[in-house]
Amino acid sequence: MKGLLSLSVLPVLAYASPMIVDSIHQDAAPILSSTNAKDIPDSYIVVFKKGVSSSSALAHQTWVQEIHTSTESKRLKKRNQFTFKNEAFDGLKHTFDIAGGLLGYSGHFDEEVIEQVRRHPDVEYIERDSEVRALESVTENGAPWGLARISHRKRLNFGTFNKYIYAAQGGEGVDAYVIDTGTNIEHVDFEGRASWGKTIPENDDDIDGNGHGTHCSGTIAGKKYGVAKKAHVHAVKVLRTSGSGTMSDVVKGVQWAAESHLKQVGETKKGNRKGFKGSVANMSLGGGKSVTLDRVVDQAVAVGMHFAVAAGNDNADACNYSPAASQNSITVGASTLTDERAYFSNYGKCTDIFAPGLNIQSTWIGSKYAVNTISGTSMASPHICGLLAYFLSLQPASDSAFAVAEITPAEMKENMISIASKNALTDIPADTPNLLAWNGGGSDNYKEIVGGKDNATKEHISSTLTEKLEQLAEEGLTAIYNELKDVVVA
């Protein structure tokens, strides 16, 4: 029965909108459900209040497993007596500790157990576990124009549509965690710079059987298809071959990535890893609104990870989806070759920036040479993740003689937004930032890029000369044009 909420619950619901509280009792933690996701029956994510220690959390988790075992034993006896009592519950599934900033667990419990859990004084709220999916994509014929677009201020033309201008060291020293369906780590485009990190779904294989994660990885760090061509990809599999999974598995995957990042930071401080420049992560997935997933992503950002997430493909307000609504990640909408908002792209104040997302060619599964061309904000977000890795690689390494204060995710997000091409897109709603990602036009000087010296002079000269060469081609001087065009535009 729904009723009035205590004041202590109000901050959670303000953060949670659009979520519903489907079960309210006095002195009990609320149970939250998303308004636009499919719940997984009898599956829950339990989040502890701030201030609960790791030892207290462990004691609670031991307690909940004990009462689960007890109720299951009683259930088994009833099932032996009454054949219609055939439900079985699995108990504790995952435990969560995101660098001490968010503690909790997930599991499959009956109503008797969950009622005891929600009355425990350490519990802040309970969220129904729900389905998460790789954002739907459309397979079409096309060309990899996205890299070219983020390296030019002006709309692409005949001379620039396939010219990616970039710093050669882009991505070097940066780890990229692709939290998705996995990655075809044997693909030649990764040049050995991809490794399997972790498989979260129980009893699943360490392969990408879907292709979605491999495509995202290629856009981030592939030799031919990638923004940051020297970054190292870590596959974090949270979705099964079908492209779907559970919210609790995704949360656990984010935790694993954050822990791996912190381990690399520690190894660098010990002198065991040279040239480390930081970690980025991409999540081209989504489901309904989840307070927990948004908070977990924000906590991973708080420990130093740079996160890009897809806005979603429902042509709707991105604030109604997770992780698109997370506050500290960079939420990415999709643009087209003609500089329009892609017809499917979500929008709204939770969208931070746009990047190419229609007809994007990248790596695929099936062989180490496979490629595919698909569309979606899933394809836009990896452009930003790659750009985060690209910009991080332009910083001095923390173990070098030229080391400077580490650039924080908040600073990087602010800088990326500040240098983006403004008002470049059409069909952008009034409450949505009209910003298109830009990589600095080939400059390898990050300070120069963010300082406003946006390499405009170089690009202006290149663009002007390209136009002149195109005129030569039109006048029949094709041989001269073919000889000079690559030199001028590169």
Swiss-Prot record:
Subcellular location per the Swiss-Prot or TrEMBL entry: Secreted
Active-site residues annotated for this sequence: D180 (charge relay system), H212 (charge relay system), S378 (charge relay system)
Chain ranges of the Peptidase S8 domain: 144-450
Main location: secreted
Annotated ranges, domain Inhibitor I9: 43-133
Propeptide: 27-134
UniProt-listed InterPro entries: PCSK9_ProteinaseK-like, Peptidase_S8/S53_dom, Peptidase_S8/S53_dom_sf, Peptidase_S8_His-AS, Peptidase_S8_Ser-AS, Peptidase_S8_subtilisin-like, Peptidase_S8_subtilisin-rel, S8pro/Inhibitor_I9
Molecular function per GO: serine-type endopeptidase activity
The enzyme's E.C. designation: 3.4.21.-
One GO process term, biological-process aspect: protein catabolic process in the vacuole
UniProt keyword list: Glycoprotein, Hydrolase, Protease, Secreted, Serine protease, Signal, Virulence, Zymogen
A GO CC annotation given for this chain: vacuole
PROSITE patterns: SUBTILASE (PS51892), SUBTILASE_HIS (PS00137), SUBTILASE_SER (PS00138)
Glycosylated residue positions: N282, N455
Signal peptide: 1-26
Family: Belongs to the peptidase S8 family.
Role played: Secreted subtilisin-like serine protease with keratinolytic activity that contributes to pathogenicity.
Name of the featured protein: Subtilisin-like protease 8
